[in-house]
Amino acid sequence: MNGAHKQSIEEQEKAKFSFSGATLYGINAVIGSGIFLLPQKIYSGLGPASLAVMFGVAILVMLLSACLAETAGYFDKNGGAMQYSKAAFGDFVGFNVGILGWAVTVIAWAAMLAGFAKIFIITFPAFEGYNLPISIGMLILLSLMNIAGLKTSKMFTLTATVAKLIPIVLFSLFAIFFISGGVSKGNFTPFLQLESGTSLFSSISSTAVYIFYGFIGFETMSIVAGEMRNPEKNVPRAILGSISIVSVLYMLIIAGTIAMLGGRIMQTGAPVQDAFVEMIGPIGAPLVSYGALISIAGLNIGESIMVPRFGAALADEKLLPEGLGKTNSKNAPVIAIIISGIFAFLLLLSGSFESLATFSVVFRFFQYIPTALAAIKLRKMYPDKKVTFRVPFGPVIPVLAVVVSILMIAGDNLMNFVWGAIGLVIASGLYFVFHGDKLHKSKALPH
């Protein structure tokens, strides 16, 4: 029996992501098909000056990632911000962070499934009108693949990530050689180009929020930390490594597109594709087109791994019924996979994910802000704990990350605070449904 059990554990460990695999998983979780539309969306507000805002947002994401990297070093299991909040501030806070986090990831997955169908039909017009069947078919396929075990999902995730990075990396490399030419042609002049009737502050705020959408997903790796080998060491390194790579790629893609098209960015529906064609000829168009499809397919595969494990982590911590965390012989959280799939299916049928996604940004920050605060608290609670990465300058960076995050929420829409309050009331109500008046603080560090 012991030998069989040992072999089973060895097989489970082998199925997990290595450090390089974890880094690729992190890149895949952030880069979706939206990267191919990003230059046009942000150029409309500020012109070439959007590059400066991109740099600023990348700094914010690095601050949040640094906090995430430190807190991840305390844990070796799934849950991400929920785990950190629970350990630092107790079950009530952990439940709120976890339930809102799970909800927003299900909503995001439904949106990504719909996005996959849309891009699939753009690539293969013969399937026009079959959006819903394509989305549901993808959902069922990924759920079955996930039930088959992490090894299968991992193989497809890494394959899709490498495939989608080919056109992105190629474009970025070519962009390096064309940026100076774009400067000479005047495509970066004037540097600041405000839309008529808008203020500088509102343009910066809206552009910053849109750019931030492009980075959403960097927290995903911490949510599935239990699926990584040696997570306390590898997850912090992979978080910082993946977000650094993504930041460089984003900057080069935006700069390269502006260099090639300048103001013509606003006159095309496919800015990166058109810019790539000008760089390397007609072959650039299909490279970007198929790259976008593979990109969002890879994103969906990654979400199918993460979303149910978020719910299962809540069950593992006894914040939701333990049956939700039940695993099959392949160590896949089969009940959480089915329930997550049902919720995503219902959202696809209703179409409500679109309206929900518009204010879900505030619930994303419910993952980021508690993580930054937990970095300060856990450091005080466990001063002797050696972590792979420790945020420098004491509490300065976590506090700065929290302040800038709040400014981002307000800059997007002040109604975000109302939506956030409503979400907290609902989540708190659910906590009392499941736990009655058992408000207690969990101070034990998980092992």
Residue ranges and their predicted role:
Residues 83-84, 90, 121-126, 191-194, ...:
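TM-loop-TM module centered on a large, flexible mid-protein loop between adjacent transmembrane helices
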Residues 156, 323-334, 368-417, 437-447:
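C-terminal membrane-solvent junction of multi-pass transporters and transport-like membrane proteins
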Residues 117, 130-185, 216, 239-243, ...:
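Membrane-interface loop-to-helix entry segments
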Residues 1-10, 86-88, 113-135, 167, ...:
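Helix-loop-helix connectors at the membrane interface of multi-pass transporters/channels
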Residues 1-40, 44-49, 55, 62-66, ...:
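Membrane-interface "cap" regions at the ends of multi-pass membrane proteins
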Residues 41, 53, 62-139, 143-147, ...:
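Hydrophobic transmembrane alpha-helices that form the core helical bundles
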Residues 162-192, 254-261, 372-385:
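Hydrophobic alpha-helical segments and their helix-loop junctions in multi-pass secondary transporters
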Residues 17-36, 138, 178, 193-257, ...:
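Hydrophobic, membrane-embedded alpha-helices of multi-pass small-molecule transporters
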